[in-house]
From Swiss-Prot:
Catalytic residue list: 87 (schiff-base intermediate with d-ribose 5-phosphate)
Enzyme class: lyase
UniProt catalytic activity: aldehydo-D-ribose 5-phosphate + D-glyceraldehyde 3-phosphate + L-glutamine = pyridoxal 5'-phosphate + L-glutamate + phosphate + 3 H2O + H(+)
EC numbers: 4.3.3.6
Pathway linked to the protein: Cofactor biosynthesis; pyridoxal 5'-phosphate biosynthesis
Source domain of life: Eukaryota
Example of a GO biological process term: amino acid metabolic process
Designated name of the protein: Probable pyridoxal 5'-phosphate synthase subunit pdx-1
UniProt-listed Pfam families: SOR_SNZ
Organism for this UniProt entry: Neurospora crassa (strain ATCC 24698 / 74-OR23-1A / CBS 708.71 / DSM 1257 / FGSC 987)
Residues annotated as binding D-glyceraldehyde 3-phosphate: 171
Length: 308
């Protein structure tokens, strides 16, 4: 739920959503150093996510995961010319204000970090900076958009290298959009209003989604995307682009190896329905991170359930 009931500023939201449209068809990579950021840019990433620890290391370390140190974010901003994103804890308005003051291009209100508020998400339309947020289903996606999110991503299970949850989330969103389209076609606005109540979504946003046949903002894949094949799979399901976290730099033997991996994922996203190019990308990528199977995870180890 949101901390206030203010209405999204239409003009501001249109600008923010338009900025996110410029990332379509691209790959956004998690980076922890200026050197990694430069590798990502050289590989063709459309943006980088600056954070002190990649999700797999956050999992391994445990404890409380917070916003990255501003000095580290500033170093990455100075190192590259592509957009720089950074993560804030769910509900942590002040972390978001700090990131906005830093001039980051996008703020990710992220379940990968330890939530600061177990009741409210940040009211994102009160910020000039655009936000990206995760979702597991259409209701979550539309609630975040109603709060002002200009970009949506699947939650998946970050840091695992297991794409199964990201697949589940995009399939769920797609199925519920199809359900909304059918409701609008067969029962009109009353049927859409009924579905909106059931999934906890704004009626007008759900109607717009049904009319468009997709979310009204850019929707990227994230969480467990570890290989070129994973990235292409998510594009196959209709994602507009892909976030890759631990899969690029985790276990990379050298900077050259990381660059090779990064280029392979960018190639796969750009050529997701060209299977000859995908064969090349998989060969170029080489061995993937070992990862963690979602099947063996305890409920308390899962990040995707954070947020509501």
């Amino acid at each position: 739920m949101t901390s206030t009931s203010t209405t999204t500023n239409g003009d501001s939201f249109t600008v923010k959503a338009g900025l996110a449209q410029m990332l379509k068809g691209g790959v956004i990579m998690d980076v922890t150093t200026p050197a990694e950021a430069r590798i990502a840019e050289e590989a063709g990433a459309c943006a980088v996510m600056a954070l002190e620890r990649i999700p797999s290391d956050i999992r391994a370390a445990g404890g409380v995961a917070r916003m990255s140190n501003p000095s580290m974010i500033k170093e990455i901003q100075a190192a590259v010319t592509i957009p720089v994103m950074a993560k804030a804890r769910i509900g942590h308005v002040t972390e978001c204000r700090i990131l906005e003051q830093l001039g980051v291009d996008y703020i990710d209100e992220s379940e990968v970090l330890t939530p600061a508020d177990d009741t409210y998400h940040v009211q994102k339309d009160q910020f000039k900076a655009p936000f990206v947020c995760g979702c597991r289903n259409l209701g979550e996606a539309l609630r975040r958009i109603k709060e002002g999110a200009a970009m949506i991503r699947t939650k998946g299970e970050a840091g695992t290298g297991d794409v199964v949850e990201a697949v589940k989330h995009i399939r769920t969103v797609n199925a519920e959009i199809a359900q909304a389209k059918a409701a609008l076609a067969s029962g009109g606005e009353l049927a859409v209003a009924k579905m909106a109540r059931e999934i906890g979504a704004d009626v007008e946003l759900l109607k717009k989604t049904a009319e468009l046949g997709r979310l009204p903002v850019v929707n990227f894949a994230a969480g467990g995307v570890a290989t070129p094949a994973d990235a292409a799979l998510m594009m196959e399901f209709g994602c507009d682009g892909v976030f890759v976290g631990s899969g690029i730099f985790k276990d990379a033997k050298t900077p050259e190896h990381a660059l090779q991996r990064a280029r392979a994922v960018v190639k796969a996203v750009a050529n997701w329905n060209d299977y000859g190019a995908l064969v090349e990308a998989c060969i170029e990528h080489g061995e993937a991170m070992k990862g963690i199977s979602n099947a063996g995870m305890k409920p308390e180890e899962r990040m995707a359930g954070r947020g509501w």
